[in-house]
Amino acid sequence: MENHVVELVQPRHTLIGENSILEIPQFLHRLEGTVTALVVTDQGLVKIGTVKKVTDVLDRAGIRYWTYDGVQPNPSVGVVNKAMEQYTRQGCNCIIAIGGGSPIDVAKAVSILAANGGRIEDYCGVRKSARPGVPIVAVNTTAGTGSEVTCAYVITDEVKNVKMVMMDPNCLAYLAINDPTLMVGMPPSLTAATGMDALTHAVEAYTCREATPYTDALAIEAIRLVGRALRRAGADGCDMQ
C-alpha cells in the first residue's frame, strides 16, 4: 500500500476579527532589528481610505514605511520589478500587503526576490526558492481568493503573455489579517463576486482528490457560512453578522 503523506502549510500567525489591524505593530516589533516596511497596495484602496486605516496604525506606533500603490489586477512581472526596486531603494526589511489577491501576490513575489535574488521568472513552478522570503503582513480586504493564507501566487509574464503559477511555502505570510472593518462599504457587485469566489474555493477544496478530513471540515463550514451570509452582505455591506 502506498504511503500517503499530507502536508499542511499555513501562515505563522492569523488574526480574524474587528479592528485586528490594531495588532500589527506588536507583531512587527517581534522581528529582528528596526522595521522598515514596504506597503504594497493599489490606487483604488488608497483613494477610498482603506490604506490610510492601516498606515495610521503604523504612524501611531512609529513604524517606518514606504508605499508602492502601482498594483493592477493580474499583476505583471513589470509591476513586481517596480515594487522590488522601491523595496531595495528604501532599505526595507518586511512587506505589508493591503488588498485582495493581486497586492498579496506581488508582496509574495517581492518577498521571494528579496531573500533569494534573481528574476521572478526563475521561481515559476513548485518550491523553486532556496530560502524563506522576508516577512509579509498580509492584510486582506476582500473575501475572495484566500491569498493571505496560501503559499501560491500568480504573476503575468507580459512578454510571453502567460500567467506564471508559483507554489512555494517560503512565501507564506508571517501574519495574515482578516479585519471586517476594512471590507464594509464595498459595492454590492464586488461583495457578490468575491463571495462567490470564496464559495467556489470551498467547493473545490471539498471535491478535490487531495481532500482530507481536516480540509473537509473547513470547506463544509465555509460553504455553510457563505450560503447563510452572502445575500445579507450584498444587501448591507456594513452587516457584521
Predicted segments — roles?
Residues 22-38, 56-61, 89:
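Glycine-rich phosphate/diphosphate-binding loops that line cofactor/substrate pockets in enzymes
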